[in-house]
Amino acid sequence: MLQFLLSLLRLPACLRCFGARRRLVPGTFTRRCLVAAVSCCLAGPATSQSPPAESRFQTFLAPSDTLHKGRLRLLAGGGAAAYTATSIGLYHIWYKDYPLGKFHFFDDYGEWENMDKAGHFLTAYAESYLAYKGARWTGIRERPAAWIGAGVGTLLQATIEVMDGFSEGWGFSTADLAFNTAGVGLFLGQELLWQDQRIMVKVSHTRPNYGAAPLTSSTGVTRTVEEAATILYGKFPASFIKDYNGMTAWASVNPASFFPKKKKPFFPRWLNIAGGYGAQNVYGAYGNAITDQEGNVFSLQQYPRYRQYYLSLDADLRRIPTRSRALRTLFTALSWVKLPAPTMEWNSLGEQKFYWLYW
């Protein structure tokens, strides 16, 4: 009985806690909030019982205030395993069909309408940022964690460049190295200057519908455009990395983060403005021709290559208010993905297009 009376004294505070939500979301959600408030009060004061599994999970996801050696070992071991698995995966996706040779350099700037350079830039940025968040989770202080993130991003991309250097199909590219460094530098510069990522580098990808138009080689072999594109770019998941016709690279800016924290902007703090770059009808490094495994060459010169420039809205999921550590972790993990939104396109053919939703 005494516990019940004490709970009633807590009822106004609980209702005030849910009252703000009542003004925002009417109807069923409001009723559920009120029921939850009453249930919270009737549950009585906290006891010394062990926290529920969900609470322990939330605590596990929260960054540690001090260096947590167990987390550090877990992150280091998991990172080493992921590094090994990724290196093996990249070898099978990119390099296994080409012989290895002596280490050599190769100037590939301008190939693939520079979509591969955009890929290097955004990948180096994303790797650095996610490694930084992992370091912070273990309790490493902010500035050292930023340098660790930059080091991890540099190491991962350097692995690819070294593989390129020994592959007869490619070579070590100083242009790739420059874009890798720029991606890492964008992350590190923002972290050291603002302790925040106000400009996020993101990607979106939708594989085009290549269609069934016939292509005939000089030897009389016929394939469809879809089949030729699959020869060049592969199928999912390899095509997500390799198909430059479906990829768009974005710089997503959060305007609210440039306002003083005490000054509330007139738009949501999670709303971003994004500029994007893409290309279409890219069927080769410089020219549009695809060679299959039998040596048949299919020309696609009838499909002119062009570059695309985009302006779109976006959302910085990390800035959406939530008390759920699980959601915060998920939002951080997805922070490199551009969300579908209304988009304007300008391209090198002189066209302008509008999309209600573009991804």
Place the predicted regions along the sequence by residue.
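Residues that define the transmembrane beta-barrel architecture of outer-membrane proteins
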Residues: 243-249, 269, 303-311
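Transmembrane beta-strands of outer-membrane beta-barrel proteins
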Residues: 152, 156, 199-201, 269-275, ...
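N-terminal targeting leaders of membrane proteins
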Residues: 34-117, 121-128, 132-137, 224-225, ...
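Outer-membrane beta-barrel proteins
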Residues: 133-139, 188-193, 253-264, 317-323
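Alpha-helical transmembrane segments that form the membrane-embedded catalytic/substrate-binding core
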Residues: 120-127, 164-191, 310
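Transmembrane beta-strands of outer-membrane beta-barrel pores
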Residues: 205-209, 277-283, 317-319
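Small-polar-interrupted transmembrane alpha-helices in polytopic inner-membrane proteins
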Residues: 82-86, 145-165, 181-184
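Residues on the lipid-exposed face of transmembrane beta-strands in outer-membrane beta-barrel proteins
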Residues: 185-189, 249-255, 311-317, 354-356
